[in-house]
């Protein structure tokens, strides 16, 4: 409202500053009749704080008990003591503790279930891994038993055949075994065998001259069941000479085969060596693929030959006498 001319309006610091800046004391609006008075808002707590009167302030400043009570009340509000007392009255603390305890129990039970499930899964996986191994072991055992049975049957058949063979066949088998075991020293073994056979023939010739019934029985026991006890000394000597000739022919054939196998193995080894040499030659670095940057990155030049380095770096007649380091 506009101030009357007879009354002196209450002027404050703000009004004085506005008048100095050119304000004429008029209000807002079209007719300029807006309020120009200062609006003061008093707080509800008149005894304490900014809105308190002077008398209240004086009384409280001297009364320390009231100030301490007010201070404690403010601290209680800030710390939430009133809420704590209210919860205790209504027994809400106990309920919340029970709820939190139940939640923790549920979480722990879920964790235990998850762990048990994971353990069961791992156990099942381990069992599934173990099962095929057991099957394989059973199969391998069955295969081994089959092989053992087949080997036993073959051994029994071979033993029966050996029993039926004559002494000439046994001697030939022994000579064959000796020749196969001594294939590497064939020349020496042949000479020794010939000497032994000559000695045996001489002994048998002497025994044939002084043959008797007892000698015939001993010779029949040493020979197989197929050889007859009534065979004469001449027939024995002829059969032995025939067996000796056969053994010699067999030994010769085996020696030839061993020599051929040795020659073939030597030729194959020489061919393999030639192929290795060719492969080594192929591994040499081609100059078209190499670059100068690879030489700069390389820690040593030993990977390249002298010719490769000259082709990469270019021919330099002034530095031709210099020897480059190559592979050792």
From Swiss-Prot:
InterPro entries the UniProt entry points to: G_patch_dom, PINX1
Question: Could you tell me where the Acidic residues compositional bias lies?
Answer: 116-126
- For bias kind Basic residues, which ranges apply? 101-110, 248-257
* Gene Ontology cellular-component annotations: nucleolus
Organism, as annotated? Dictyostelium discoideum (Social amoeba)
Name used for this protein in its record: Uncharacterized G-patch domain protein DDB_G0278987
Instruction: Recall the GO molecular function terms of this protein's record.
Output: nucleic acid binding
Locate the compositionally biased regions of type Low complexity: 141-158, 210-240
Domain G-patch residues, every copy: 10-55
Q: Which PANTHER family match?
A: G PATCH DOMAIN CONTAINING PROTEIN, G PATCH DOMAIN-CONTAINING PROTEIN 4
Q: Where is this region: Disordered?
A: 97-291
What's one Pfam family the UniProt record gives for this protein?
G-patch
């Amino acid at each position: 409202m506009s101030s009357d001319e007879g009354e002196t309006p209450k002027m404050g610091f703000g009004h004085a500053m506005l008048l100095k800046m050119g304000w004429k004391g008029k209000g807002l609006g079209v007719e300029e009749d807006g309020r120009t008075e200062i609006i003061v808002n008093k707080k509800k707590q008149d005894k304490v704080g900014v809105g308190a009167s002077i008398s209240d302030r004086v009384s409280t400043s001297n009364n320390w008990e009231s100030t301490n009570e007010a201070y404690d009340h403010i601290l209680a509000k800030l710390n939430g003591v009133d809420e704590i007392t209210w919860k205790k009255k209504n027994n809400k603390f106990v309920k919340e503790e029970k709820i939190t305890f139940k939640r923790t129990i549920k979480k722990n039970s879920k964790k235990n279930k998850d762990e048990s499930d994971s353990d069961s899964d791992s156990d099942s996986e381990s069992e599934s891994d173990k099962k095929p191994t057991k099957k394989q072991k059973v199969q391998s055992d069955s295969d081994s038993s089959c092989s053992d049975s087949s080997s036993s049957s073959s051994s029994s058949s071979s033993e029966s055949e050996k029993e039926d063979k004559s002494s000439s066949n046994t001697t030939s088998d022994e000579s064959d075994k000796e020749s196969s075991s001594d294939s590497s020293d064939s020349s020496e073994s042949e000479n020794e065998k010939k000497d032994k056979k000559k000695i045996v023939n001489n002994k048998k010739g002497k025994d044939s001259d002084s043959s008797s019934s007892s000698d015939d029985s001993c010779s029949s026991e040493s020979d197989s069941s197929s050889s007859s006890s009534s065979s004469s000394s001449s027939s024995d000597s002829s059969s032995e000479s025939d067996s000796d000739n056969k053994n010699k022919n067999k030994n010769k054939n085996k020696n030839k085969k061993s020599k051929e196998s040795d020659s073939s193995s030597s030729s194959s080894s020489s061919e393999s060596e030639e192929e290795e040499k060719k492969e080594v030659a192929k591994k040499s670095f081609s100059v078209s693929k190499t670059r100068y940057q690879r030489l700069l990155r390389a820690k040593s030049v030993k990977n390249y030959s002298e010719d490769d380095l000259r082709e990469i770096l270019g021919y330099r007649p002034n530095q031709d006498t210099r020897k480059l380091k190559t592979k050792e």
